[in-house]
Curated annotation (Swiss-Prot):
Protein source organism: Mus musculus (Mouse)
Occurrences of domain LRRNT (ranges): 32-60
Cytoplasmic side: 273-298
Name by which UniProt lists this protein: Leucine-rich repeat-containing protein 38
PANTHER family: ANTIGEN BSP, PUTATIVE-RELATED (PTHR24369), CHAOPTIN-RELATED (PTHR24369:SF210)
Subcellular location as annotated: Cell membrane
Entry membrane topology: Single-pass type I membrane protein
């Protein structure tokens, strides 16, 4: 007689062990985005896929993310909060238009950031705050027309900065002075205007020529009174000598405000003095009359 034995179901401990083994095999967040290639446990390659946004999901512990050649318009605000292990981000040739405040929160390990060939037009104060370990930052071939003097604050480890081929006409030297480890900076390919606002940057460039990989010949500027561009090598500190006697817009505001304040103070003082004199004149005749009355009584 054959006995029919019911199949055994795994005990709770066995099921938990099996699930644990599966998780170990899969690892933390091992999902690879559709159409991308995860060439190793810490690299995700999504280049030239026509993606409209940052792919999701992908391994949470990714260290190298390649998304160049897509149509991505923004970096999610919480992106680095979930992917804090990221060291290398290639974001070239996308449609990025702006960097929102807090975009790089949680990017404490990021060392290489390539944002070249995007549509950035402005960099605000603290644009890269929290990315203090950045070593190389490329912003080349964007449409940058303005860089805040505090745009690179906290980037104390930055060694390479690429600002070439943008629309910069001027740049506050304070933005560069905030980078103590800077070794290489690209400033060529911009429509610099050699006016008095450029004088401070010219002095900085003269003192840091060794940091310019293409030298002074590659950087050109337009002369305000002439319809031509010249290489910085053709200029000298003497070219900006007249700027020592010129006043900036801030200086003019201070002078105007001081003049108005002095004028108001003078008017108030004159009014007060006139009032005192008038009161004195009114009181003086009465005193003279009293003196005459006293003389008559005598």
């Amino acid at each position: 007689m054959s006995l029919c034995v019911a199949p055994r179901h795994p005990t709770g401990a066995a099921a938990a062990l099996g699930l644990g083994s599966l998780l170990v095999l899969l690892g933390p967040g091992r999902a690879c985005p559709a159409g991308c290639a995860c060439t190793d446990p810490h690299t995700v390659d999504c280049r030239d896929r026509g993606l409209p946004s940052v792919p999701d999901p992908f391994p949470l512990d990714v260290r190298k993310l390649l998304v160049a050649g897509n149509r991505i318009q923004q970096i999610p605000e919480d992106f680095f909060i979930f992917h804090g292990d990221l060291v290398y981000l290639d974001f070239r040739n996308n449609s990025l238009r702006s960097l929102e405040e807090g975009t790089f929160s949680g990017s404490g390990k990021l060392a290489f950031l390539d944002l070249s060939y995007n549509n950035l037009t402005q960099l605000g104060a603290g644009a890269f705050r929290s990315a203090g370990r950045l070593v190389k930052l490329s912003l080349a071939n964007n449409h940058l027309a303005g860089v805040h003097e505090a745009a690179f604050e906290s980037l104390e480890s930055l060694q390479v900065l690429e600002l070439n081929d943008n629309n910069l006409r001027s740049l506050n030297v304070a933005a560069l002075d905030a980078l103590p480890a800077l070794r290489t900076v690209r400033l060529d390919g911009n429509p610099w205007l050699c006016d008095c606002d450029f004088a401070h940057l010219f002095s900085w460039i003269q003192e840091n020529t060794s940091k310019l990989p293409k030298g002074l010949d590659a950087i050109q500027c337009s002369l305000p009174m002439e319809d031509r561009r010249v290489a910085l090598r053709e200029l000298s500190e003497a070219s900006f000598s007249e700027c020592k006697f010129s006043l900036s817009l801030t200086d003019l505001f201070i002078i105007i405000f001081s003049g108005v304040a002095v004028s108001i103070a003078a008017i108030i003082s004159s009014f007060f003095l006139a009032t005192v004199v008038q009161c004195f004149q009114r009181c003086a005749p009465n005193k003279d009359t009293e003196d005459e009355d006293d003389d008559e009584d005598d």
